[in-house]
Each structure stands twice: as structure tokens, then as C-alpha cells.
Design a protein with these regions (language model features):
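N-terminal Rossmann-like dinucleotide-binding module
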Residues: 1-53
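Beta-loop-alpha module in the N-terminal Rossmann-like domain of NAD(P)-dependent dehydrogenases
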Residues: 23, 53-110
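A contiguous active-site-proximal alpha/beta segment in oxidoreductase catalytic domains
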Residues: 101-158
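NAD(P)-dinucleotide binding in Rossmann-like oxidoreductases
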Residues: 193, 211-287, 305, 334
Length: 336
């Protein structure tokens, strides 16, 4: 256990919008972290939010960089690269919200800068820190079929990214992490409903293991649904991201009976409700970054999730391109 007398971590948040304020609240909950400042190009907005929490307001992220150990980047996607680059080059460890960058080349460059500066670069795949997902990884074995649904109503504040980058990238990341094999083929369709970008998308991924994954994302559905269902040889597993809940269906017995020329089939099964420790996934993600920062400060090794981050982004970008260009199916070659 680390000594309580360790220096506190100084943190900052770049972006005082909807997502940025979630990060602010998460930092404020951590006893070993001091939230130093909040950045927004709208200085009046930054001041309003900063005053609420008794911290400093900045209009320029480069001013914040000199005062913090870690910083969250929660700005529009097209600004992720320049903001994260500036923070890394000025010595801050960085959590950049997903999607990491608009291009794979920019994402690779950020990781290069992080290595060069000996800084931690963490990408905000928050569902990795969902308690149900962490439990799921322990029980999934040889999946046959994966069915993912992330559906919800349209939010006018999110129009810069397609539904693939806004929502589906979470599920791409989780599915790729669950299958012990390589994707070989992708089929994708999508359409625009409420914005100038794709709002509904359906994707099928075939792996070299034979696993088939169907991923559906929508921001045109009035009910909010966040589920993942997995068929494997010994069980059917259903995860609810929102409830952080897992149900496992297993066959208990089956029998055939014959009565005067008719055959009846009876099958019995049992359902196991897996207890999951529920916590705020974003808070856990930020705690992970703080812990990694302390280990790096102590000279201990910190393993980045670079390959996983790049692979998820690469597939999301390819799916987005397929839908935009009307390409229904491609053979997948990992560009990472």
C-alpha cells in the first residue's frame, strides 16, 4: 500500500461541456486529487463552471498544462489531436475521450509523442471499466455469436460525430476484446435520420475463429437500450451495461417423450444472476489513470493499451467509411 503522505495529483479538465462536467465530478470525488482548473474556449462558461467548484478558469489549455499532472480532453473530436499533443508535450499525462482522433495517423502520432515524453496517454473507453464487463471477461469462452445493441434517442448536442464514433465504438472495443481471434470480414449498413451524419448503423464482423458478431447502434430509438448477448457452447449470457447486470442461462436437462404417435420435447434450464460490484465506470477509469500516474512517477512500468485503442479506432473508421461510400462488405486487414 502506498503511503498516505504521497503528493496529491493535480488534475485539470479541458472542455466544460456535457462530457467535461462528468469528468469534473469524477475528479472531485477522489480524495487524493486536487482539481486545479477547467478550460473552455468560452471563458465565461469556464468561469461559471470553475466558480461552482472553486477552481481556476482558463481559455487556453496550454496555460493549464504547466499547473497539472494529469488532464482530461473532452472537447469536440476534431480538436482532440492538437489539444492532447500540446498537453503531452508540456508534461501532462492525458486522458482523451473517445473517439481518440479523426484519423488513425493522428492517433499513432499521439502515442509516439507520449512515448517520447514518457507520458501516459489513456483513451476514454469507459465501458472497459464497467463492473459487468470486467466480470464478463472472466466467463466468456469460445463465443459462437455476439449480439450488441446500443440504442437511444437523438441528442442534439452530439452532431459532429456519426453514431459509429459516438456510440458504436464502445461495442467494437468490447467485442474485439472478447474474441480470441482476428476479424476477417466486415459488413456494414447505416442511414441518417436526425442529423447530417449516420444515425443508425448495423455491422456484422466475422472472425477467423468462426465467431460472428452483430453490432447495432442507433440514436433514433426512443427507448435507451445497452445490451450485449453472447452465445457460447455451454451458456447464453446477457449483459446490461446500464444496470451493470449479467444473467447466465444454462441447460439443465432435456428429454423426449412419445405418446400415441406424437413426440414431445421438454427442456429445462436454469438462470444464474451474477452479482456485480456496481460503481461509476468513469470514476474507476480516472482512478486507473491516477494509479498509473503514481506508478510512472515511482519509476514502475505502466503498460498502455495502445494496440487495443488503435485497433478499435481503425475498425470504427473503416465502418464509417463503408457506410459513407456505400461499400457493403470488405475483407479486414488490421492497419495497426
Amino acid at each position: 500500500m502506498r503511503a498516505i503522505s504521497e503528493p496529491r495529483i493535480r488534475a485539470g479538465v479541458v472542455g466544460a461541456g456535457h462530457m467535461g462536467q462528468y469528468h469534473i465530478l469524477a475528479f472531485m470525488e477522489l480524495w487524493d486529487v486536487d482539481l486545479v482548473g477547467i478550460v473552455d474556449t468560452d471563458l465565461a462558461k469556464a468561469r461559471q463552471v470553475a466558480d461552482t467548484y472553486g477552481v481556476r478558469a482558463f481559455a487556453d489549455h496550454r496555460e493549464l498544462a504547466e499547473s497539472v499532472d494529469v488532464a482530461t480532453v473532452a472537447v469536440p473530436t476534431e480538436l482532440h489531436f492538437p489539444v492532447a499533443r500540446d498537453l503531452l508535450e508540456r508534461g501532462a499525462h492525458v486522458l482523451v475521450e473517445k473517439p481518440m482522433t479523426p484519423t488513425l495517423e493522428e492517433a499513432k502520432e499521439l502515442f509516439r509523442i507520449a512515448r517520447l515524453r514518457n507520458r501516459i496517454l489513456h483513451v476514454g473507453h469507459v465501458e472497459r471499466f464497467n463492473g459487468a464487463v470486467q466480470e464478463l471477461r472472466k466467463i466468456v469462452e469460445r463465443p459462437i455469436l455476439i449480439e450488441s445493441r446500443r440504442l437511444g434517442p437523438f441528442a442534439p448536442r452530439v452532431q459532429d460525430d456519426s453514431v459509429v464514433m459516438d456510440l458504436m465504438i464502445h461495442d467494437i472495443d468490447i467485442v474485439l476484446g472478447l474474441v480470441d481471434g482476428e476479424p476477417r470480414k466486415i459488413a456494414a449498413v447505416g442511414s441518417s435520420v436526425n442529423s447530417g451524419r449516420c444515425d443508425v448503423a448495423n455491422v456484422q464482423v466475422l472472425f477467423d475463429t468462426g465467431t460472428m458478431a452483430t453490432i447495432t447502434a442507433s440514436r433514433a430509438t426512443e427507448e435507451k437500450i445497452r445490451t450485449l448477448a453472447i452465445t457460447q457452447p455451454d451458456a447464453y449470457i446477457v449483459l446490461d451495461y446500464t444496470e451493470q447486470d449479467i444473467h447466465i442461462y444454462k441447460r439443465a436437462a432435456q428429454e423426449y417423450t412419445m405418446n400415441r404417435g406424437s413426440i414431445r420435447y421438454r427442456r429445462a434450464s436454469f438462470v444464474e444472476h451474477l452479482k456485480v460490484h456496481r460503481d461509476n465506470p468513469l470514476k474507476l477509469e480516472i482512478q486507473h489513470l491516477i494509479g498509473a500516474t503514481r506508478r510512472r512517477r515511482a519509476g514502475e512500468p505502466v503498460m498502455p493499451a495502445q494496440q487495443d485503442d488503435l485497433r478499435s479506432l481503425a475498425m470504427a473508421l473503416e465502418i464509417e467509411r463503408m457506410i459513407r461510400d456505400g461499400v457493403p462488405e470488405v475483407a479486414w486487414r488490421d492497419p495497426c
